[in-house]
């Protein structure tokens, strides 16, 4: 039988997933990058109605620097299972994370709700991404967890002007990939976006890597 959205994005109040978060940020006015490591917990808090009037779930994110510390509230997200897709709203941007049918090489425009072409947008790099599945229903090891049925969503992998040489005036790199596990949800995410401009010899951008630690 073919998989449902619920199989790979189960939403129940009280469900949580904890991750190691490796956060890549620019430092020293953009001349370099550094990585900060945290733990984060995503907790399904309540069933709500989203801004389109559909049943959805509110998800709280908590963060701490290391396992001995108390969790601190950090962010709030909205997740909607439409029956044929799984939408996730983060910082007011609505992503179509999963879409039926779940099968290798099936492709969809996962960022189609995001306004990325207006004149002053800083989101141009999100324009026209083709998400597609691979390694459907395959086992995977994520962190220390062995997972028996996972799907990989490749969202983007492109670059311009890389590797950077002394002649490079502009460069850009985008990487985005997620793995979902059956009956758990997202277990891995790797995202990186940066731009380099020779005119001020600096980088802008950021990256995040989420790696599953634990879940209920």
Describe the residue ranges of each PLM region.
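Conserved functional acidic sites
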Residues: 1-216
């Amino acid at each position: 039988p073919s998989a449902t959205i619920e199989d790979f994005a189960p939403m129940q109040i009280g469900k949580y997933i904890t991750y190691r978060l490796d956060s890549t940020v620019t430092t020293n006015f953009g001349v370099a990058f550094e990585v900060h490591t945290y733990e984060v917990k995503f907790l399904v808090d309540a069933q709500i109605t989203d801004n389109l009037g559909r049943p959805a779930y509110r998800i709280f994110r908590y963060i701490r620097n290391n396992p001995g510390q108390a969790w601190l509230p950090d962010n709030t997200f909205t997740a909607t299972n439409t029956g044929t897709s799984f939408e996730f709203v983060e910082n007011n941007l609505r992503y179509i994370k999963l879409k039926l049918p779940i099968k290798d090489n099936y492709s969809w425009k996962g960022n189609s709700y995001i306004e990325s072409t207006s004149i002053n947008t800083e989101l141009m790099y999100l324009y026209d991404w083709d998400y597609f599945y691979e390694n459907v229903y395959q086992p995977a090891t994520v962190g220390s967890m062995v997972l028996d049925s996972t799907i990989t969503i490749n969202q983007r992998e492109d670059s311009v002007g890389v590797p950077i040489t002394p002649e490079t005036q502009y460069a850009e790199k985008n990487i985005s990939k997620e793995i979902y596990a059956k009956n758990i949800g997202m277990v891995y995410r790797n995202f990186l976006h940066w731009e380099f401009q020779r005119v001020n010899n600096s980088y802008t951008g950021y990256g995040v890597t989420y790696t599953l630690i634990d879940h209920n």
